Amino acid sequence: MGQKINPYGFRLGITTDWKSRWYADKQYADYVKEDVAIRRLLSTGLERAGIADVEIERTRDRVRVDIHTARPGIVIGRRGTEADRIRADLEKLTGKQVQLNILEVRNPESQAQLVAQGVAEQLSNRVAFRRAMRKAIQSAMRQPNVKGIRVQCSGRLGGAEMSRSEFYREGRVPLHTLRADIGYGLYEAKTTFGRIGVKVWIYKGDVVGGKRELAAAAPAGAERPRRERPSGTRPRRSGASGTTATGTEAGRAAASADESTAAGQPAEAAPAAEPQSTES
């Protein structure tokens, strides 16, 4: 069901790609366990870096790790000291040479994982959950590539005795459409009265033929094509109202008179209007 399943895994191979790319026969379970350890290491040690995604690719003697972050300066550190420390920890964990690539996220407001992390940080700082959710929705909807967003918080909201779930949605979020490009993020906020889970879904349009489908709507201020008229003529106006008179009986008579005069023929008089009487 599209409402329950993870949107990323539901569209795997259709609109999304694998985040771990390698092949193994007998070492498959060991590599999966190692990938989980790598992601856990990067998520626990770099909370303030704003990591949106981690991609892992393996060869026979090398492991390549791509870190997509909104704050690359925190991951790199002063003179690259933090990046060297991360690389050393990963080499100690994997036992192989590690190639570390740090990539900057251009629009963090349109990344579901970063939006969820931002809402969770506000909840940890005692910000009202409804205010944090609405602020995140407003920031995301300002982005041109975002067509819909849904933010959900679950837990002891506002310190209530009984836990509950609340969500806000703006725009379209078609969870059951396989061609829809939907980002999903999950983060937990640690508060004094327990943990609050934050989930974010962001819809960025449909993917058709490997390309994102954009709305081809014309801008509001675009000019409409004008109809050209013969040179030397002017549109006829009726009185001071500014409306063209060709649609009235007098206007049609005047237009036929002008055509007859231009052709050298006498113009026919317009028929007199018949008086209308109302019976009492």
From Swiss-Prot:
Recorded superkingdom: Bacteria
Region entry Disordered, spans: 215-280
Molecular function in Gene Ontology: mRNA binding; rRNA binding; structural constituent of ribosome
GO biological process terms on file: translation
Keywords, alphabetical: Ribonucleoprotein, Ribosomal protein, RNA-binding, rRNA-binding
Pfam family, one: KH_2
Entry GO terms, CC: cytosolic small ribosomal subunit
Keyword Phosphoprotein: no
Ranges annotated as biased composition (Low complexity): 238-280
Occurrences of domain KH type-2 (ranges): 38-106
Entries under InterPro entries matching the protein: KH_dom, KH_dom-like_a/b, KH_dom_type_2, KH_sf_prok-type, Ribosomal_S3_C_sf, Ribosomal_uS3_bac-typ, Ribosomal_uS3_C
Matching SMART domains: KH
PANTHER family per UniProt: 30S/40S RIBOSOMAL PROTEIN S3 (PTHR11760), SMALL RIBOSOMAL SUBUNIT PROTEIN US3C (PTHR11760:SF19)
The protein's role, per its UniProt record: Binds the lower part of the 30S subunit head. Binds mRNA in the 70S ribosome, positioning it for translation.
UniProt similarity note: Belongs to the universal ribosomal protein uS3 family.
HAMAP family in UniProt: Ribosomal_uS3_B
Subunit field text: Part of the 30S ribosomal subunit. Forms a tight complex with proteins S10 and S14.
Protein name per Swiss-Prot or TrEMBL: Small ribosomal subunit protein uS3
Organism: Mycolicibacterium paratuberculosis (strain ATCC BAA-968 / K-10)
